[in-house]
Amino acid sequence: MSTSLRIDINAVSDAVAGKWKEERLHGREVASDPRFQTIPGQSMDEHRARTLEQLGWLVDAGAVHRAYPTELGGSDNHGGNIAAFQELVFADPSLQIKSGVQWGLFGAAVLHLGNSEHHEKWLPDIMSLKLPGVFAMTEIGHGSDVASVGTTATYDPDTEDVEVHTPFRG
């Protein structure tokens, strides 16, 4: 009589995928698209431009609205959103970080700290990437010591531009 142990691979896969299996699988599908894969050897400027382009592709793929309110086209699914976005790191870590900044930090700050006027005014453009956001905590040539950030950003109302100045050479 054989006493070999058998593992149900499908059951293990379902358990590992967790509560938000469908969202995680969608994230894997998106991450497997060659448009989202890292291109080795790109310059920093090329990689940044590509990452911004990839964010637009995420919008087109319907991959960014899960955590936002249903009345704005989202699905109020924060856990599913996190599960799906975890998968992006396998395509390009910079894409995962930048998308986390756009929709997880910038958009979530407006969503959770803003009022209904802010939501109506800014969230649709944040969700569609018409209004790109930033989160300043690291400096080229200096690192991520948030307490010692030396870069400043000054809004010029005459030009409607933001002037960024850093004392650190990159």
Give the role of each language-model region:
Residues 1-134, 143-144, 155-163:
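Amphipathic, small/basic residue-rich leader segments at the start of a protein or domain
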Residues 138:
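Cytosolic ligand/metal-binding cores
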Residues 145-149:
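Short acidic, glycine/serine/threonine-rich loops at helix termini
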Residues 150-154:
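Hydrophobic/aromatic beta-strand elements that line small-molecule binding cavities or substrate pockets
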Residues 166-170:
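DPxDG-like acidic metal-binding loop motif
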